[in-house]
């Protein structure tokens, strides 16, 4: 409901980002020690483990099977259902807004690492880590610089430790206001990450972006759940991924 939905989706989002943090952390170590090829092997192994978990422990709910429909007809029906859902103006406006958000989000992984590699001098931070926290220095630095993926990974780390706290305050806002404010905060954060060559601007900007993400993304899922007509839950929740796809395109 409106009271618990935002918190529930926030907790779900936090759990997703545990994997989002551990994956790059493991890949960072492996690519430094063994080269880039091992990362693809790592990804295949993790996917294989997930598949085994699903096969062994997931039980498909029993549903009554209707008459079989040709694949082409199913495809046409799916497109028609999406168009029908997009006739809901509230949903369409939010999805358009989130296209911009996901376009910004992808810069953390597509553009920012290249910017850090070419323009950010994190030598002082690298030296401090190696002198004071050798374990983190070994894991996070290479050739006198902090590895780019660890700047991006700060986003997932912030979500893990602060999502429940942020969701608690977002509950007190109207859904649309929370989404818009989150998008504005995220925009400020992305702007700061690319503003100067100072690594602290990159760190602070990524942290600010994470706050905006924590406000916007789970709240959108919660809002979609609230406005969804009964019986169309899967259809409306599926439209959540339309701006994700558009953000990857842009």
Protein language model regions, located:
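Intracellular juxtamembrane helix-capping segments at the cytosolic ends
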Residues: 1, 214-229
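Loop-to-transmembrane helix entry/capping segments in MFS-fold secondary transporters
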Residues: 2-12, 145, 228-243
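Intracellular loop-helix junctions on the cytosolic face of multi-pass helical membrane proteins
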Residues: 2-6, 22, 27-109, 113-123, ...
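Structural signature of transmembrane alpha-helices in multi-pass secondary transporters
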Residues: 12-16, 20, 155, 220, ...
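Short amphipathic helix-loop junctions that connect adjacent transmembrane helices
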Residues: 110-147
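Helix-to-loop junctions at the C-terminal end of transmembrane segments
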Residues: 161-175
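C-terminal ends and interior cores of transmembrane alpha-helices
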Residues: 184-197
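Hydrophobic core of transmembrane alpha-helices in multi-pass small-molecule transporters
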Residues: 200-216
